[in-house]
Design a protein with these regions (language model features):
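Proline/serine/threonine-rich low-complexity linkers at boundaries of modular beta-sandwich domains
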Residues: 4, 12, 23-44, 56-65
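Ligand-binding face of N-terminal immunoglobulin V-set domains in extracellular IgSF glycoproteins
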Residues: 67-92, 96-103, 108-171
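Helical hinge/lid and interdomain linker segments adjacent to catalytic or ligand-binding clefts
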Residues: 120-135, 140-144, 148-150, 233-319, ...
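Structural motif
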Residues: 155, 182, 274-279, 304, ...
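Active-site rim elements
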Residues: 232-235, 337-342, 348, 451-461
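Extracellular low-complexity, Gly/Ser/Thr-rich intrinsically disordered linkers
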Residues: 250, 406-479
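An acidic, glycine-rich "communication" segment
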Residues: 311-424
Length: 479
């Protein structure tokens, strides 16, 4: 069946409704908030009067309580990472560091706890235009990362000694060894979407164009890593990456870890890995990131993009008083509000991914299987035309016939899923796989629901788990 035409077909430019598909702080988002072991309240050990268990209250950007940020998004074993924390009113606190992983279904493991620390109320954030920075906050605790620590995604939990309030600071421990798969955590996109100091996700210092009442008059063009993440300190989009990590570690894949910032700065060598995995929403890319990934593909490294809206916006890091690449600047679109797009600079994302962003999906819709005889769908139980409920959600990609494709020896679309946009127009999602002349596989899921289908309670789908295993096994050359 011929895909329906849309008004932007000729240029491959964004869908007319180009606002953010999900408000990161919207409780209706089916993939938020991130749930981790220490955020789930436990019932009392000794029976008492029937009262509801309570977890520590999260930080509130309007009143402070406790919140903080780290001096780096990623560190190598043997380096150290600094935490800058404010506690208002001042009280003692501790920092407990957890590593994300399967850990027999627990989802994380406690690694180390700081000594008792004296909390202080730091000075208010500084502002320059609408850029908000806390780079002037005093050092609260320095963590030397031992050389024996495993690479991975870590979360530092800041908790007041009285147990009433807590917040989070995510960071990554990378290593230099070659691995089958290198997971690239999207720290640039997390920070671009960070609306701190807004507590409700609206009108904050974020590069995201949606839900910003000041957008037209005074757009944000620069944000900084020198500030906490809004709300409880954990980027809502981080859950997508954590889903992939828990699932992949459970099944024993040989994983390395890095961040988008590492990729930008050249701190990792992509071609040393069989595949690069981009596990979650990874919208904001630098020129250096794209060049590194394209070069890796040309050298035979496979690419796995597990979320829609990848490589959509173009961003440029810059130095700050606190260090290199601590600022993120995004130019504005030509003649329209919002950050600059790759496809408006003659480098549409489809030229790397094989598909590109089509628009938001207002309500979850089924993913419709196509080419079910392909090896990706082998042993999944999926048949031609099967509907995988809820697997097209948040946002969707598709193939644009008039936008150039990357060079390929093989190419196939593995899903074609209709949905309606916010105006009621018919749209469709597609899942893409192609093989580059170098032999590298390039997979793009085309949906924001793929990663949660791997390990998220209430969203896990064994067919997607098996399909992803087929892909990873092919890349890792497992029999």
């Amino acid at each position: 069946m011929r895909p329906e035409r849309v008004s932007d077909e000729a240029t491959g430019s964004p869908a007319p409704d180009d606002t953010d598909p999900v408000n990161p702080f919207d409780p209706l988002d089916p993939f938020a908030p991130v749930t981790l072991p220490w955020t789930t309240p436990s019932p009392p050990a000794v029976p008492t009067a029937p009262t509801a268990p309570t977890a520590p209250a999260a930080s509130d950007d309007g009143r402070g309580r406790i919140e903080g940020f780290a001096s780096a998004s990623a560190v190598a074993p043997g380096d150290s990472i600094d935490f800058h924390v404010t506690v208002d009113p001042p009280r003692p606190f501790r920092v407990t560091v957890h590593r994300i992983g399967h850990y027999d279904g627990r989802g994380a493991a406690e690694i180390v706890t700081s000594p008792r620390l004296d909390g202080t109320a730091q000075l208010p954030p500084l502002t320059a235009g609408r850029t908000v920075s806390c780079h002037h906050w005093w050092l609260s605790w320095r963590l030397p990362v031992p050389s024996y620590w495993s690479a991975g995604a870590y979360v530092a939990v800041l908790a007041t000694e009285d147990g009433r309030h807590q917040a989070h600071v995510p960071f990554t421990v990378r290593d230099d060894r070659a691995s089958d798969l290198l997971l690239v955590l999207p720290d640039l996109t997390w920070q671009a979407y960070n609306p701190y100091p807004a507590a409700d996700g609206r009108a904050g210092a974020s590069l995201a164009p949606a839900d910003d009442e000041h957008e037209a008059a005074d757009p944000v063009t620069t944000v900084t890593f020198d500030r906490p993440y809004a709300g409880d300190g954990l980027p809502p989009q981080a859950g997508h990456a954590y889903d992939v990590i828990r699932w992949a570690e459970r099944y024993g894949y040989d994983l390395g870890y890095a961040t988008a910032g590492d990729l930008h700065a050249g701190r990792v060598a992509p071609a040393r890995h069989r595949g690069l995995v981009f596990p979650g929403r990874d919208e904001y890319w630098t020129d250096e990131m794209r060049t590194a990934v394209e070069d890796a593909r040309e050298r035979g490294t496979s690419l796995v993009f597990l979320a829609a809206r990848t490589l959509y916006r173009r961003i440029e890091p810059a130095p700050a008083p606190s260090g290199s690449d601590r600022l993120l600047t995004c130019g504005r679109r030509r003649g329209r509000p919002g950050p600059a797009l790759w496809r408006e600079n003659d480098r549409a994302e489809q030229q790397l991914l094989g598909i590109q962003y089509a628009g938001p999906v207002p309500r979850p819709r089924p993913l419709i299987v196509r080419n079910a005889g392909h090896w990706l769908w082998e042993a999944t139980g999926a048949h031609e035309g099967d509907a995988l409920d809820g697997l097209v959600a948040g946002g969707a990609d598709r193939y644009y016939p008039r936008t150039p494709l990357p060079a390929h020896d093989e190419r196939i679309l593995l899903a074609h899923s209709p949905y309606g946009d916010r105006q009621g127009a018919r749209r469709h999602q597609e899942t893409s796989l192609y093989r580059a002349p170098s032999g590298a596989w390039v997979f793009a899921s085309g949906t924001l629901a793929w990663s949660p289908a791997l390990d998220r309670p209430g969203h896990a789908d064994p067919r997607i788990q098996r399909a992803t295993a087929n892909l990873f096994d092919r890349i890792c050359k497992r029999d």
